[in-house]
Design a protein with these regions (language model features):
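N-terminal active-site segment of His-dependent metallophosphoesterases
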Residues: 27-115
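C-terminal/domain-terminus segments
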Residues: 102, 110-117, 121, 276-285, ...
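Short acidic, glycine-rich surface-loop motifs adjacent to enzyme active sites
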Residues: 214-233
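Extended active-site neighborhood of metal-dependent phosphoesterases/phosphodiesterases
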Residues: 58-60, 64, 109-217, 237-260, ...
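Active-site glycine-centered loops adjacent to acidic/histidine catalytic or metal-binding residues
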Residues: 40, 104-105, 143-144, 223, ...
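N-terminal secretory signal peptides and thylakoid transit peptides that target proteins
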Residues: 1-18
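Short, solvent-exposed loop/turn elements at domain surfaces
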Residues: 33-35, 43-49, 202-205, 229, ...
Length: 383
């Protein structure tokens, strides 16, 4: 049964959270807070020439086929829809909001030159910092488009362009030295572990978990899903999703379940909630998207609302044949207790307290929430 709140239940949980925070205002600030969450945003300019004038994908390649479609999408989004979403997100910030978290794909990429790619990162960060988060830390994690375009630009790895441009900004925003796209920070008693899903470093991830054993909630933040949820041909785009990584993937999954972690992810341009209970513990995943592709996507209706709708197996996919795909999803399907999937696009608010952790979804630039998901509810024994 999907744990979605009606208005009365939401108010009751809010009251419990306030009581659980204690009498001291300092303790309340530490234990009860909110985070504004943006999914993929694909910052771009309506004019293709601003960032993409030099990008010429090889004739006949997949990139050449999808590039015109991508550019039409970017033009449509950044001709008004994304500006409206950003303005609405600014209004979502409350006195208890501690920071703004962006789940990767800050920019579109496809720049062809290192200097232009760096400028796009600078401009994308600057736009959301100024428009949404001028007075709070703005924390974008790395997505595939943030290092997109090609492996090298001007004889320089794109990932190095990203590191040189973004890590100093993250260090300034968080007030700590960030020297790697996989990093961790604390918000009160909670751990936010942000990972580079493009180049996953499992030993580093496990080390950061080991260094923070005494936390209330563990949030693992990844652009790609921690638990694969898409049955399309590109479902391999999840954390440690290559077949060669299956041993470390299972090890990390087991550790996250043991810690009863909450995964905050993006990439698929969908809203997805998945809750899994295993012999080791529990892992809850929420996938968000802020790529507002069309007006109607602000009110998109659910496509799946039960575990039976999880992960339709594709006929073929890169890295996996059909039997291998069935085996992969078969590792997760028996543990799934709740599942929800929608094409709705917008922004989210994460509310964290002793009594509960909830995620509230707002479609497009709408002021009224569409639904609230319960990620943890201590009062119901679901912590």
């Amino acid at each position: 049964m999907q744990r979605e709140l009606n208005r009365r239940q939401f108010l009751q949980l809010g009251a419990l959270a306030a009581l659980g925070a204690g009498c001291s205002s300092a303790r309340s600030d530490a234990l009860s807070y909110s985070v504004l969450v943006l999914g993929d945003v694909h910052f771009d300019a309506p004019d293709i020439g601003v960032y993409h004038a030099h990008y010429k994908p090889k004739a006949g390649s997949v990139a050449a086929k999808i590039f015109p479609m991508r550019m039409k999408r970017e033009h449509d989004q950044w001709s008004g829809l994304m500006q409206r979403l950003a303005a609405a997100a600014r209004k979502d910030i409350r006195p208890d909001t501690k920071f703004v978290l962006q789940l990767g794909d800050l920019i579109q990429g496809n720049c062809a030159k290192a200097a232009i790619h760096a400028k796009m990162l600078e401009d994308g960060f600057g736009y959301f910092k100024k428009t949404v988060s001028p007075d709070l830390p703005f924390v974008p994690i790395v997505g595939n488009h943030d290092v997109d375009g090609s492996i090298w630009l001007d004889k320089k790895p794109v990932r190095e362009v990203y590191r040189e441009t973004m890590l100093p900004k993250l260090s300034q925003e968080l007030g700590q030295s960030i020297g790697n796209p996989t990093f961790a920070f604390r918000q009160g008693p909670d751990l936010f572990l942000c990972v580079d899903f493009n180049f996953p470093d499992c030993p580093r991830i496990l080390h950061l978990l080991e260094d923070n054993p005494d936390v209330r909630y563990t949030f693992i933040v990844s652009h790609g899903a921690v638990v694969p949820v898409c049955g399309g041909s590109h479902f391999r785009w999840f954390l440690l999703g290559k077949k060669k990584d299956e041993v470390v993937r299972r090890k990390l999954y087991s550790e996250l379940c043991r810690r009863r972690a909450i995964a905050l992810v993006g990439h698929n341009h969908q809203t997805v909630f998945a809750d899994l209970v295993t012999p080791e513990g529990r892992l809850t995943q929420f996938m968000a998207t802020s790529v507002w592709e069309a007006e109607k996507q602000a009110a998109a209706q659910p496509r799946q609302t039960t575990p039976e709708g999880y992960a339709k197996i594709p006929k073929k996919a890169k890295d996996y044949d059909a039997d291998e795909a069935r085996a992969l999803f078969g590792e997760y399907r028996p543990h799934l207790t709740d599942f929800f999937l929608s094409g709705q696009q917008g922004r989210c608010r994460l509310d964290v307290a002793d009594a509960a952790v909830t995620m509230t979804m707002f479609g497009g630039d709408r002021a009224e929430p569409s639904r609230t998901f319960v990620l943890r509810d201590a009062s119901a024994g679901l912590a």
